[in-house]
């Protein structure tokens, strides 16, 4: 039978030794290359939105880096969960891609102020859940515009910089900053 597994470092190899709890059967016709990418992006995102972010139907989800691998997964999983999805990316072309896979709204953070645009799109409320695989200089303005009791999911640092957030914002917003490390979660809680 064709199977795939999350194997951590070396997990994209053609052969690997992994815990049986991390192995899953592949549907017929599902290519191994696709399976390797699928497991990493969609499992990370499902864990982030369901387990860590507790995204609920009717809530607003802001996805940063929305045209990337985990970003596109977040748009699709967010829609399946019943969220209103706002996709933030660095170009209009990437925004069009995000709309084509289900995003309700888009923000081009290269040409507009993401904080102002998010407030505009949410009637001043902000996003209930922020999915952030980007980090860098977007983190603080986005966190400043998060909804009351919002959940800010730290998924990665694609921009390179690890942001420093003023923790008084978490207090003032009643918000949570939640780390997402699916690989470690899968290892510890298979």
PLM regions and their residue ranges:
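Short helix-loop-beta connector
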Residues: 28-33, 54-60, 124-125
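Short amphipathic alpha-helix with an adjacent loop that forms part of the alpha/beta core around
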Residues: 113-124
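N-terminal Rossmann-like NAD(P) cofactor-binding module of classical short-chain dehydrogenase/reductase
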Residues: 4, 62, 107, 130-131
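Short glycine-centered segments of the SAM/dcSAM-binding site in methyltransferase folds
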Residues: 2, 60, 84, 150-151, ...
């Amino acid at each position: 039978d064709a199977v795939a597994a999350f194997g951590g470092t070396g997990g994209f190899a053609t052969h690997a030794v992994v815990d049986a709890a991390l192995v899953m059967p592949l549907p017929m016709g599902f290519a191994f290359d696709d399976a390797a990418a699928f497991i990493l992006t969609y499992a990370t995102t499902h864990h982030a939105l369901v387990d860590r972010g507790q995204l609920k139907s009717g809530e607003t989800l802001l996805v940063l880096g929305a045209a990337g691998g985990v970003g596109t997964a977040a748009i699709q999983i967010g829609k399946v969960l019943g969220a209103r999805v706002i996709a933030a990316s660095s170009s209009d072309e990437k925004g069009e891609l995000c709309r084509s896979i289900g995003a309700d709204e888009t923000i081009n953070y290269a040409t507009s102020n993401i904080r102002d645009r998010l407030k505009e799109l949410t009637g001043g409320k902000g996003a209930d859940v922020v999915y952030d695989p980007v980090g860098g200089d977007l983190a603080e303005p986005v966190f400043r515009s998060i909804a009351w009791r919002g959940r800010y999911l730290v998924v990665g640092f694609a921009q390179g910089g690890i942001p420093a957030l003023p923790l008084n914002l978490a207090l003032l917003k009643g918000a949570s900053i939640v780390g997402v490390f699916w690989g470690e979660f899968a290892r510890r809680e298979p």
